[in-house]
Amino acid sequence: MAILSIDQGTSGTKALIVSAEGAVLAKGFAPVELTYLAGGGVECDAELLWQSVITAAAMAHGNWDGGKQGIEAVALANQGESVLAWDPDSMRALSPMIIWQDSRSASLCDARLEYADLVRMRTGLTLDPYFVAPKMAWLRENVTRAGVVTTSDAWMIARLAGAFVTDVATASRSLVFDIHRQCWDSELLDIWGLGAERLPTVVANAGIVGSIACADLKFLRDVPLAGLIVDQPAALFAQSCLVPGQTKCTYGTGAFLLANIGAAPRMSTHGLVTSIAWNMRGESAYYYDGQVFTAGSAVQWLVECGLLAGVHEIDALPRDARGIVASPGFAGYGAPRWQPRGTASIAGLSLASTRQELARAVVDGVAAQVAELIGAMGADAVPVQRLRVDGGLTQCRTLMQAQADLAQVPIDVYPHPDATAIGAAALARLALHPALRPADAIPVWRAQQTYEPEWSSDRAQEFLHRWRMVAKHTLNAPDG
């Protein structure tokens, strides 16, 4: 029996059919078009996003010769911090989907700085528009007060199976969820003016929440919906990061560094945030999280500016940017700087500089941001000895070697391009088979390739020093 695992991501929706052994039997994909607005807005048409879910699932099913083998369950991974308003009766979207990169609610965070310590101690998070509650409050103030306002997963689950729920990992990204008691926090909700909102019930990650009843997915009717989780901890699970200290980084639209820190929450003192990775069978795992908001989207900017023809050209870039240093914070900065109004900056250009060298500097800048996060992990007593990586950009040898050089750790490339969907499928299998151990639900994997550092530690530190000097000039840019 197979799992149909849906990964609803920033740039599109993937659907995989995954066998009991973890083999990917079929795939489907449908893109999602984002709109970038003045003032830091990033959104998409929510109904078109939903159609991408239907299209990807139908495509995967259509590409699969199941024979006698049926679909045992549907799993769902979501973006985590993307928000919309919707009608709980008709299921119709009442607003665009406000994407996790959106920073228009920065001023709402500024107005609540007096609560920063309280928020941090209860939620593990920093007051930043990246997280859910500021977007919810901004949407209520600026778009509509009708319907309910939730993260994207609650809406998709309601449309798939009729249940009004969210999973504990997603809830922990909200700024209004107590990660110690694992419940919504009424005081924090009031701080954001959300005390009267109807919120979804919070459920464990490896449980069954209902059966598919969506008219657009008749071929899945009555199949259990199980295995609900945020995309990043799903990838952490897929890469078998089950022991404290094990760390992964996913390189997609952004780059996200997560380290398992065990069964109890710990607060970072170096700018990282703490969230719930998963709760299953009454036991939880927590993680430290650091974010680079523009990784794949920085490469896409290079393409749109004509500096690259496509991602495939990255590995043809020169080995050195000849003094150009880039801090590609096109959507602001997450950990450890937390500067939503920060911008990108490039230094060291001359008349002799080439477009290839500029592109190389941007690629190195992405790796430098991740290296800075790895340093913060070490300062928080979670030293990264090896880094497991996944996502589309891991196929770029130039970026991965730069990452090994700047972070000064070996890089193990996960062999599948769809770690998030594989992780969600493993959680669904745990929901269906109570006797199955978590480690046995995860497909065994070996690194597709390992990158060892070629630079000396001194050379890496010298580069990171120059990069930090450039990054400092990008912070606190004026609104506009």
Where are the predicted features?
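Active-site core segments that coordinate phosphate-bearing ligands/cofactors
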Residues: 4-6, 110-166, 175-186, 190-191, ...
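Conserved small-residue
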Residues: 15-17, 22, 74, 102, ...
